[in-house]
A protein has these predicted regions:
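Short beta-strand segments at enzyme active-site cores
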Residues: 11-17
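Active-site-adjacent betaalpha module
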Residues: 4-8, 20-145
Length: 145
């Protein structure tokens, strides 16, 4: 999804949950030539870290595509806070994960019950493209092959 963001000129904000203790985001992600904004946090919800919330607001978007690690904790709390702030939230189910599958599914079910739209990566990408005549159709298609 991050590479698709680069291709489609979609802003990307990456958070790292306590990288000193849990490790940093992979260089494969950070070094994508999109220059994503990478910010550290210790809160579970992105919106509870002022610097990250300000970075999200600065993008001027009302639709947020969300994915990440610990679906049932960080992703869930972020999604719920985004909804409260008036954002339209789309979770990429197959780009998110929890250590336990049961927690992942419970987090997804809870988000869905709160109005978060649950998509797969492929569904999201083709909804963004709308048509095979989109100028970046081939590039996006190659990402999912």
């Amino acid at each position: 999804m991050i590479e698709a963001g680069r291709i489609l000129d979609i802003p990307v904000v990456i958070s790292e949950q306590y990288p000193k203790g849990l490790g940093q985001t992979s260089n494969q992600i950070i070094n994508i030539p999109l220059n994503p904004i990478v910010l550290e946090k210790t809160t579970f919800s992105l919106l509870k870290t002022e610097e990250i919330y300000n970075a999200i607001k600065a993008q001027g978007k009302k639709q947020i595509i969300l994915f990440g690690i610990e679906t049932h904790i960080c992703v869930l709390q972020t999604a719920l806070d985004l909804i409260k702030e008036g954002y339209e939230v789309y979770l990429i189910k197959n780009a998110s994960k929890s250590r336990k599958e049961s927690e992942h599914e419970a987090g997804i079910n809870h988000m869905q019950s709160e109005g978060i739209k649950i998509l797969t990566l492929e569904i999201a990408l083709f909804e963004l493209l709308k048509s095979s005549t989109h100028p970046h159709f081939k590039e996006i298609q190659n990402l999912i092959k």
